[in-house]
Amino acid sequence: MVSPNIKSYVENTLSKDEFCLLLLGNNQNKDYTKKDCFILMGCDESDYWNSNQLEAGVHVWKATEQSIKVVSNWMNFCLDSRIIKDDKSVLSEELTSFKAHRNDQSILTNIAIMEGLSVSNQEFRNFIECDYDYWYERYPNSNLGRDIDKFLIKIKDA
C-alpha cells in the first residue's frame, strides 16, 4: 500500500539528475546473494558483499534513456537462470554467512552498486506498507506516526 503523499516525497527527494529511488533494506548482500550471482555479474568483491541489500519490491523510476538501460540490464540478468535461480552455486563455494538467495533483489542490489544508483534513507518507509493486511491486525499497538499509517486509518474508518 502506498500513501498518496509519496508523490511529493519523491519529487522533493530526487534531484533532476537522478532517475531512480531505491529502498535500502537491513540485510547484508553477502547473506542473501549466492556466489554464482556475484561471479556471473562481475561483482565478486567485498564492496558488493558488504553492502546492505535493497528491497526490490518498492522502487521509483523516471522514464529516461538511462533508467531504461538499467532496467533492461536488470531484466537480462534476471533471464540468466544461473544468476536468478535458487540452485546451488557451481562456480565457487558460497560465502560463509550465506543464508539464501534473494533472486531479483540480489541482482538489483549488485546493479545499484555497479551503477551508483540513488538509495533512499528510511524516510521512504513512512509512505509505504508492504504488509498492509497484517497492518490492520497490529495497528492498535503501533505508534501511528507514519504518513501511511494515517492513510490506512482513513481507509479503515471509511
Predicted regions and their residues:
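Glycosyltransferase catalytic domains, chiefly GT-A lineage
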Residues: 1-158
